[in-house]
Structures are given as C-alpha cells and as structure tokens.
C-alpha cells in the first residue's frame, strides 16, 4: 500500500511533468523506472475516462483515494479501506465506431494481455475467471438423461512467473525448448538450434535464441519484421526489438531479458541506449560462434541451415560495401565441381595445388550447366577446382570479398584472388602460349574485324582463345562486370542498359574456324555474316543467355543446311 505522500509522489509528480521529466528530475538517484508505480500508469487513460486508486499503507491509520480524469490534475481524499494494499478502478471510455473499449471487460482479453506482456513477472497475477463444468449425473437419471452444465468462478494465476530462460539448464529438456519456440513464435517445426546465453558485466542479460528449421514464408520480402522480444526484469517492453540483431542474422528468433537497461520508457530512448548496443554486439558474436560450432561439429545440420538461410549470409557479406564480409566469409558455402559437395572457402584453399594462382568460379543458373562450360572444363582438366555459383548474389559476394587469406610456400601470410573462368586471363597458359594466341589474333585481324562488324556492336572484340579445347567458340567478359552479373542486373528496374564488355573467342584448331577462313578468302560476305551470327548465338546459349534474334538464328541455321 501507499501513504498520502507516496500517492502524491508516485502519481502526482508524473501527472504534472510526464515520465521523461520525472526521470530527468530524479536522474541523480540513478533509478530504474520500469516497475515503479506510476510510470506507465497513465497509459490507463488510453482506455479509461476515470481512474481511481485507493490505497492503505502498512501501519497507517487512514486510507487515501487518488482520482483523476486525466484532463486537469487529480484529487486526493481520505477513503474507507480496512485491509492493507492498493486497488485500481478504471471506468472505461464509451465505445466508438473505431475503438471498442468494452473488450477490456472480457476476461480472456485481459488474460491474453497479461500473458503477452507480463507472463514473467516474479509475482503471481491472479484473476477470477468464469468457467463451465458438467453437473454430476443424478443417481435416478434415466436413459434419456442429457448432461447439464453450470458456470462457476475460479481464481486463476495468469502468468508463468519463472521464464524458461531463467530456469537451470539441467532442468530444461530439449522438448521444453522446442515447445516454447513453437508456441512463442507460432512455428510448426522444431528449431534447428537452440542458443542460450547468460552474460554479466558491462551488459548483463539472459538470452534464449533459436535458429528456425525452415524459412518463414515472408522472410525474403519487405513485410518480414526482424527482432528479438525484449524484456526488462521479466516485463516485455518490445515484441520485436530490431536493434538487437544485424540484418544478416535477422532469421534468429528469441528473447532477451535484462535487469539493468539504463533507460527503458519508450522505443525512442531505448534505441539510443548504450546497454542495447553492448547487448547487440555480444549477441552477434554469440550467434556467429554458434554457427561456426555447427559448421565444424555438425556439418549436416549446418548444410540444412545453409539451404534455408545461406542467401541471407551472402547478402550480409555483400551489403554495406562489404563492411561485414570479413566477419562472415568463413560461414560461406559453395558447390565444388571437383568435390561434388558444398565446401567452405578455407576447405577450397586447403586443397589448392601450390601452382594454382586463383580461386576459380563460374556463375550461372545450374551446377550441371556450369560444369560443362568450356572454360570450366579447361580449369578442371588442369586439376584445379571450380566453385559453381547458382544464386544471383553469389558472384557479387565474391567480388566484394575480392580475395581470401592463404599462406605462401614459405609460410608467409598472403591472399589469393577470386577469378571468374569467363573473365580475363585465367593464369593457366605459359608466356609462349599467350604469345602464340596474340600472334594468331594479329594474323587474322581482317577476319575478326569483319566478324565484329557483322555482329554490329554486340562484342567488344573477336580474338583467338586460349581457354578452348574441344568447343569452337565461347564468350568472355573484359572488365569488372561479368556476363552473369549483367543477367542479374538486367532484371532490376532501371538497369536495362547495363551491359558487360563481351569478347567472342574462337578455337583456331576447330574445323569451324577453317570454314570461317574459307568464307573470308572466297569473299563470301553473306556466308561469313551468317557464320558470325550462328557462332555468337551458340556462345550465348553456352553462357545461358537468350539469343538476341531467335528468328534470324533459325533462318541462318536453315539456310546453311540447304
């Protein structure tokens, strides 16, 4: 209970100045106002047109009544109350077309509110609830007796009081965590991993986190809301606190409970709280360490996780200009053409031959097609592995990483760069082989210029290839924008004009090249143009690109078959 002075102090002061002023005026006391009677009390006026508080303190001779309509001050008068304690009486506002205040008179609505916001208050919150039960069957009831029911009231404790995250770990079974997760976060599947954390020191908190077993239906949409449920001493103050999680770990669900949040009245002040920032940094490290542990100790489960949320990790590495790339790079998985399984970048590095200069990759829409690319086959024939990237974000992720740590032959720290098998020099040829290709390109300059003119600006250059073995032709990209990146960017609004600088590469040892030379030497410009169109279209198809002009391509094929 409260005395007259305590009613005046706890309710009157806040009524005059507001909770933030109350905090400011009492900042020297270093008080925590969550749970203080009065703070949040005035939210009652959101639903009530009058609030009455009747209280009698322990050992006091008189009870006092505080009353206010929330408009102009309050009254404080003596009251009749024999027992010690406090009663709060709300006179609800009248219902309107938009607000139904009378719903707060329904016991299930009140019970739901308590369950949602105050389920873990340390003290029991009880309420008399009306229930129904079947009456005992009379002894003389006949065969046609129909069961009768009666209503009764029962005092029910609405809150759990001791949250699962504060119970000793040896008292909580996996099934308990799974049930809590499914009930709390409305998921029908068990979580993939449960993370518990208790941190004391600069930031003191208890956390119970879950990595879901499946991707939420709206996860990769703008409608998805990230965040952890934030509690202060068992009172939920925010259902989804987004500031506790970085975007790349936005799939994590759970609760965080802290007893020493420094300022926790509103979202605005909470978001600026240093304790919250410390908790976020600590949680981020904890989640990353748990993912590493899963990767190293339970690979099958990690690959399940990667299938569901790997894309988000890659987006995290790429976003913000690669600010978090180094933090996340060891969590990345890609398909290995040589190993025929998912591998980490470190696992790729560990199996690289000493003479290998790059981490090779190919990007496209399927691993089967990528493994058959002429340039990928060339790298694989050399005994080097190729990472096969099949998601839009993959190549952007590796581009932002640029390189990965690798010790040289002397054990000194160094790095090795990523290399698209369809871009630039692959570092596979000797200087003599490069010189021979350059000489062959110069020797056939007239032919290549005629082919470039026939393709009317579709390629930057036509040249002799050093990356073709059995295939007659391929496309490569000159510059930072690869052909696959062009495909991805072309899907974005306003990016229709983004083009990579394509190079048409020819195999001078293939019979098709002899046919090209013959058409040029015979002065058959029409045939040379058709050959050029066919070869460019063939190179497009190999790269998974749509043919620019399918009708012209079909006509060229048919005319050459006559």
Mark where each language-model region is.
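GHKL/Histidine-kinase-like ATPase module
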Residues: 108, 143-254, 333-353, 357-358, ...
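Conserved, well-folded catalytic cores of nucleic-acid-processing
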Residues: 10-21, 25, 47-57, 91, ...
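Extended active-site and interfacial segments that coordinate phosphate-rich ligands
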Residues: 7-25, 40, 64-72, 79-80, ...
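ATP-binding catalytic core of ATPases
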Residues: 75-136, 147, 154-185
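GHKL (Bergerat-fold) ATPase N-terminal catalytic module, capturing the glycine-rich phosphate-binding loop
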Residues: 1-107, 112, 119, 135
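GHKL/Bergerat-fold ATPase module
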Residues: 81, 99-101, 122, 138-168, ...
């Amino acid at each position: 209970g409260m005395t007259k002075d305590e009613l005046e102090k706890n309710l009157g002061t806040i009524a005059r100045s507001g909770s933030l002023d109350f905090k400011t005026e009492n900042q020297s006391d270093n008080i925590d106002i969550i749970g203080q009677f009065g703070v949040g009390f005035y939210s009652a006026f959101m639903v009530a047109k009058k609030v009455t508080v009747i209280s009698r303190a322990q050992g006091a001779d008189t009870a006092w009544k505080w009353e206010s309509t929330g408009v102009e001050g309050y009254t404080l008068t003596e009251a009749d109350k024999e027992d010690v304690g406090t009663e709060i009486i709300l006179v609800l506002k009248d219902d309107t077309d938009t607000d139904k205040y009378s719903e707060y008179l329904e016991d299930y609505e009140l019970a739901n509110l308590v369950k949602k916001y105050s389920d873990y208050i340390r003290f029991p919150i009880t309420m008399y609830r009306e229930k129904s039960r079947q009456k005992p069957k009379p002894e003389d009831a006949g065969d046609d007796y129909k069961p009768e029911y009666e209503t009764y009231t029962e005092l029910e404790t609405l809150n759990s009081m001791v949250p699962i995250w504060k119970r000793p770990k040896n008292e909580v079974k996996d099934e308990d965590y799974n049930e809590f997760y499914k009930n709390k976060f409305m998921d029908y599947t068990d979580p993939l991993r449960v993370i518990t954390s208790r941190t004391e020191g600069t930031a003191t908190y208890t956390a119970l986190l879950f990595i879901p077993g499946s991707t939420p239906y709206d996860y990769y949409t703008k409608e998805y809301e990230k965040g952890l449920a934030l509690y202060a001493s068992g009172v939920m103050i925010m259902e989804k606190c987004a500031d506790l999680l970085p975007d790349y770990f936005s799939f994590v669900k759970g609760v965080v409970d802290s007893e020493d949040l420094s300022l926790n009245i509103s979202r605005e002040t909470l978001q600026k709280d240093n304790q919250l920032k410390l908790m976020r940094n600590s949680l981020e490290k904890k989640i990353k360490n748990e993912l590493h542990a899963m990767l190293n100790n339970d690979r099958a489960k990690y690959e399940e996780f990667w299938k569901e949320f790997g894309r988000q990790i890659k987006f995290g590495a790429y976003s913000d200009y690669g600010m978090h790339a180094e933090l996340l790079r060891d969590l990345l998985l890609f398909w290995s053409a040589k190993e025929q399984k998912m591998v980490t970048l470190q696992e790729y590095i560990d199996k690289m031959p000493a003479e290998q200069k790059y981490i090779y990759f190919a990007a496209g829409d399927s691993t089967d097609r990528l493994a058959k690319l002429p340039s990928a086959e060339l790298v694989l024939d050399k005994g080097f592995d190729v990472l096969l990237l099949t998601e839009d974000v993959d190549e952007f992720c590796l581009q932002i990483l640029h390189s990965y740590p690798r010790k040289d032959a002397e054990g000194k720290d160094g790095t090795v760069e990523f290399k698209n098998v369809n871009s630039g020099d692959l570092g596979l040829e000797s200087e003599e082989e490069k010189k021979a290709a350059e000489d062959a390109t110069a020797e056939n300059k007239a032919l290549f210029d005629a082919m470039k003119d026939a393709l009317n600006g579709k390629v930057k250059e036509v040249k002799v290839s050093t990356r073709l073995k059995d295939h007659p032709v391929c496309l490569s990209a000159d510059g930072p924008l690869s052909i696959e990146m062009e495909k991805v960017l072309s899907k974005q609004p306003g990016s229709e004009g983004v083009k990579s600088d394509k190079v048409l590469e020819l195999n001078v040892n293939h019979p098709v090249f002899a046919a090209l030379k013959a058409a040029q030497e015979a002065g058959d410009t029409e045939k040379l143009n058709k050959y050029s169109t066919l070869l460019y279209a063939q190179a497009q198809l190999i790269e998974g690109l749509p043919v620019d002009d399918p009708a012209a391509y079909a006509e060229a094929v048919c005319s050459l078959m006559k």
